[in-house]
Swiss-Prot record:
Function: Involved in the catabolism of short chain fatty acids (SCFA) via the tricarboxylic acid (TCA)(acetyl degradation route) and probably the 2-methylcitrate cycle I (propionate degradation route). Catalyzes the reversible isomerization of citrate to isocitrate via cis-aconitate. Could catalyze the hydration of 2-methyl-cis-aconitate to yield (2R,3S)-2-methylisocitrate. The apo form of AcnA functions as a RNA-binding regulatory protein.
Pathway assignment: Carbohydrate metabolism; tricarboxylic acid cycle; isocitrate from oxaloacetate: step 2/2; Organic acid metabolism; propanoate degradation
Keyword Iron: yes
Single GO MF annotation: iron-responsive element binding
Family label: Belongs to the aconitase/IPM isomerase family.
EC number: 4.2.1.3, 4.2.1.99
Protein name (Swiss-Prot/TrEMBL): Aconitate hydratase A
Record-listed [4Fe-4S] cluster binding positions: C454, C520, C523
CDD domains: AcnA_IRP, AcnA_IRP_Swivel
InterPro entries: AcnA_IRP_Swivel, Acnase/IPM_dHydase_lsu_aba_1/3, Acoase/IPM_deHydtase_lsu_aba, Aconitase/3IPM_dehydase_swvl, Aconitase/IRP2, Aconitase_4Fe-4S_BS, Aconitase_4Fe-4S_dom, AconitaseA/IPMdHydase_ssu_swvl
Length: 910
């Protein structure tokens, strides 16, 4: 670790009788100038550069550029950042470990040492993405779901156990433990990290990157971290720095306090709306202001969690007394807490009252103005005041008559028994039967109510509010509506401990919010099947129904393929909507139902007071954290019973449908081909705005008649055992077939028709996008995707780039790109190109039937260089337009030339 240290900043600090060495920011300021007004998040970056200064990847000029940020409040300087550790979840972690295993195989084949492929920084992988809500509203739901999860995912879990044994610095948190970001917040994160080297203990800020976009949650603990693609995380593990531009930093000033009855969820939805409107993509957001003095750590974590939804790289909170209080509450050693305080104060990383750093730009929110809110129907930034939800739904519905639909097999349906009868499509309603009773399902029905996601289940105030509201509802005699699939899936076992201690578990159970698992569940689309008669009723009457969840994303089709509108809400509002059964009820004015005394019961009658919530929170104690995290890496007997081979290289199974040897490194021993212009390319799809990584590479159900479904059936897998796309990310054959296969994706080449199809232009046939891509590959035709604004928004899903690469796509031309997906495209050797301002696919009249040549790649490739696209139209006419090459840094140029970032890293080791 000892750096070049050209500024002579290495100092020592004694804390509790132990000496720590560190690279001093105050000492650096003697040479670089006053750093007092530098944003805290940039001070963390500056310390990172001081510690890693080597004269080549980090130079004295980099240090000066970061310190000089204060002059212009922005910089175009590229720096090399090295986080202390890497965090993964299993959906992104499995393909990452598959890549590492494939790199070891390639290394062995080339005559090298496979052991060279090893994480150099600590990597924690938390298995949280696989549990599904198959069973619900019963005392045995949790045990049954765990059993099903282990049956479905045994092969994947055995592979991860192999990885845990085969790789150094690689730990796995077994299934049924919690959600990675909540485990990170409550246990893994330290705020100040230490490392023993050369007989010294070095102290430095805890920093990380994660293979999940909500890695930002840890920013609430004063830990700088954000999501990157799995590809970039793998490179970071192997010692490659994260290449980044010194960011703009937007200051968000918080003042005042939340009013009675207003939750942290209402606050984060307001912050998300404000920042999306401001435009903070690719920027840091840092929170400051006197409002932080009364903002609990859990509320800070909730706000930091949703940085991807407001578009920022991170949402950083500085260290203060509240940080120390949370570290103590969550059971961190007192020695850690004392080090955090001493180090933060010594380095100028401690929040002082009244201190205001200099920012690129600022926003201000008086928290006293926040109102009760949800976000929906299909974007997290679309905040809707509680009293306006019904009208927002009606507006979405368009008040139009929905024709009856009888395509019963249109979407994958799983689940129990029963039939749907009595369709009345003109009024958007239908009767269905279940358990011998007839119920009427209408447009706006809440069919899923899920207390889910680390965003909110990490926050005792909103969780206790949900439990207290449930208690009052039961005491009033209210019940959830029979068509509501209700579930409780916290991000940590501590939550169920404090519910039990507060005496609230039985009330949640009585309303159907029984524990279904410790994992992401509904928030990531693992909502499981609805009851079969309900699924059939929705399809027969073509109903527009709703989910209400305490999650962070609500893109159309994400939560469940049959649920078109999804509403983000606080946990107590999730319970309230389960009681109401519809989003077409104004909960501010209309009753939730009728009590056992025959009187209407309103939301205000059962909403808990801040005093009641505060009293309940007193039940949360440190011993709960100690108990639940004492054996966090051990797992249950099912996990421990998994048999795994002891070998440095993985023994690939040819008949496996979960884990396959990917083709990415087949020719790694050969020199990469020179970069050349793209000639005679065809357009694979023309897509609109806000195309998400869910659209590009879905995580949910696999349709039986899709290319991926056909592949699985051909390999002996029954549709009931398909599992999900997310669970099969270790098999490139499934994933490339699933690329652009989302049932909600709209291809303008087919008039905006929904579904993963396209026009195969040479013959005029409509084909699945995968099938068309394979035809083009047979012809030797390169492919291009054309899209609108915010291409690749959403999850940090590396398969959205990997699948694009395997389909033969050479370039994506869009109006703008979301940060992580742009980086992932470059990391997989796919060229991101941006239309010039004022131009787009519509103004250029691009239909997708054109032949395209991309010119300017043959010379010296540079970041942000202009390129030309030549167009030959269907009638033979020709023209051209300019695009901006969105390879943003010199490092990315080198990665692109090598065919991708992992190819670059692997070749450097051969």
């Amino acid at each position: 670790m000892p750096a070049l240290d050209s500024l002579k900043t290495l100092r020592s600090l004694a804390v509790d009788g132990k000496t720590y060495h560190y690279y001093s920011l105050p000492e650096a300021a003697r040479t670089l100038g006053d750093l007092g007004k530098l944003p805290m998040s940039l001070k963390v970056l500056l310390e990172n550069l001081l510690r890693w200064e080597d004269g080549s990847t980090v130079t004295g000029d980099d240090l000066k550029a970061l310190a000089g940020w204060l002059r212009e409040r922005r910089s175009d300087r590229e720096i090399q950042y090295r986080p202390a550790r890497v965090l993964m979840q299993d959906f992104t972690g499995v393909p990452a470990v598959v890549d590492l295993a494939a790199m070891r195989a390639a290394m062995a084949k080339a005559g090298g040492d496979p052991q060279k492929i090893n994480p150099l920084s600590p990597v924690d992988l938390v298995i949280d993405h696989s549990v599904m809500v198959d069973k619900f509203a019963s005392e045995s739901a949790f045990e049954q779901n765990v059993e099903i999860e282990m049956q479905r995912n045994g092969e994947r879990y055995a592979f991860l156990r192999w990885g845990q044994n085969a790789f150094d610095n690689f730990s796995v948190v077994p299934p049924g433990t919690g959600i990675c970001h909540q485990v990170n917040l409550e246990y893994l994160g330290r705020t100040v990290w230490t490392k023993d080297e050369d007989g010294r203990t070095y102290a430095f800020p805890d920093t990380l990157v994660g293979t999940d976009s909500h890695t930002t949650m840890i920013n609430g603990l004063g830990v700088l971290g954000w999501g990157v693609g799995g590809i970039e995380a793998e490179a970071a593990m192997l010692g490659q720095p994260v290449s980044m531009l010194i960011p703009e930093v937007i200051g968000f000033k918080l003042t005042g306090k939340l009013r009675e009855g207003i939750t942290a969820t209402d606050l984060v939805l307001t912050v998300t709306q404000m920042l999306r409107k401001k435009g903070v993509v690719g920027k840091f957001v840092e929170f400051y202001g006197d409002g932080l003095a009364d903002l609990p750590l859990a509320d800070r974590a909730t706000i930091a969690n949703m940085a991807p939804e407001y578009g920022a790289t991170c949402g950083f909170f500085p260290v203060d007394e509240i940080t120390l209080g949370y570290l103590r509450l969550s059971g961190r050693p007192e020695s850690t807490v004392k080090l955090v305080e001493a180090y933060s104060k010594e380095q100028g990383l401690w929040r002082e009252k009244g201190h205001e750093p200099v920012f690129t730009d600022t926003l201000h929110l008086d928290m006293g103005e926040v109102e009760a809110s949800l976000a929906g129907p299909k974007r997290p930034q679309d905040r809707v005041a509680l009293q306006n939800v019904a009208s927002a739904f009606n507006e979405f519905l368009g008040l139009q008559l929905h024709p009856s639909s009888t395509e019963e097999g249109r979407l994958l349906s799983e689940g129990g028994g029963g039939t749907a009868v009595g369709a009345n499509a003109a009024f958007g309603e239908i009767d269905y039967q279940h358990d011998g009773q007839t119920h009427r399902l209408k447009n706006g029905a809440v069919v899923i109510a899920a207390i889910t996601s680390c965003t909110n289940t990490s926050n005792p105030s909103v969780m206790m509010a949900a439990g207290l509201l449930a208690k009052k509802a039961v005491e009033k005699g209210l019940q959830r509506k029979p068509w509501v699939k209700s579930s409780l899936a916290p991000g940590s076992k501590v939550v169920t401990d404090y519910f039990k201690a507060a005496g609230l578990t039985r009330y949640l159970d009585e309303l159907g919010f029984d524990l279904v698992g410790y994992g992401c569940t509904t928030c990531i689309g693992n909502s499981g099947p609805l009851l079969e008669p309900i699924e059939k009723a929705i399809q027969q009457a073509d109903l527009t129904v709703a989910s209400v969840l305490s999650g962070n994303r609500n893109f159309e089709g994400r939560v469940h393929p049959l649920v078109k509108t999804n509403w983000l809400a606080s946990p107590p509002l999730v319970v309230a909507y389960a009681l109401a059964g519809s989003v077409r009820i104004n909960l501010s004015e209309e009753p939730l139902g009728t009590g056992k005394d025959g009187q209407p019961v309103y939301l205000k009658d059962i909403w808990p007071s801040q005093k009641e919530i505060a009293e309940a929170i007193q039940k949360v104690d440190t011993e709960m954290f100690h108990k639940e995290y004492a054996e966090v890496f051990a797992g249950d007997e099912k996990w421990q019973a998994i048999q795994v081979p002891q070998s440095d290289t993985y023994e690939w199974q040819a008949d496996s449908t979960y884990i396959q040897h990917p083709p990415f490194f087949e020719h790694i021993a050969e020199a990469p081909p020179a970069i050349a212009d793209v000639e005679q390319a065809r357009v694979l799809a023309v897509l609109g705005d806000s195309v998400t990584t869910d659209h590009i590479s879905p995580a949910g159900n696999i349709k039986a008649d899709s290319p991926a479904g056909r592949y699985l059936r051909e390999h002996g897998v029954e549709p009931k055992d398909f599992n999900s796309y997310g669970s099969r990310r270790g098999n490139h054959e499934v994933m490339m077939r699933g690329t652009f296969a989302n049932i909600r994706i709209k291809n303008e080449m087919l008039g905006g028709e929904e579904g993963g199809n396209t026009l195969y232009v040479p013959s005029g046939e409509k084909l699945a996008i995968y099938d068309a891509a394979m035809r083009y590959q047979e012809d030797g035709t390169p492919l291009v995707i054309v899209a609108g604004k915010e291409y690749g928004t959403g999850s940090s899903r590396d398969w959205a780039a990997k699948g694009t690469n395997l389909l033969g796509v050479k370039a994506v031309i869009a109006e703008s790109f979301e940060r992580i997906h742009r980086s992932n495209l470059v990391g997989m050797g796919v060229l991101p190109l941006q239309f010039e301002n004022g131009q787009d696919r519509k103004s250029l009249k691009l239909t997708g039937k054109e032949v395209l040549n991309i010119r300017g790649l043959g010379g010296e490739l540079k970041p942000h260089m202009p390129l030309s696209v030549e167009v030959t139209r269907e009638d033979g006419s020709q023209d051209s337009f300019k695009v901006l090459c969105r390879i943003d840094t010199l490092n990315e140029v080198e990665y692109f030339k090598a065919g991708g970032i992992l190819h670059y890293v692997l070749r450097s080791m051969l």
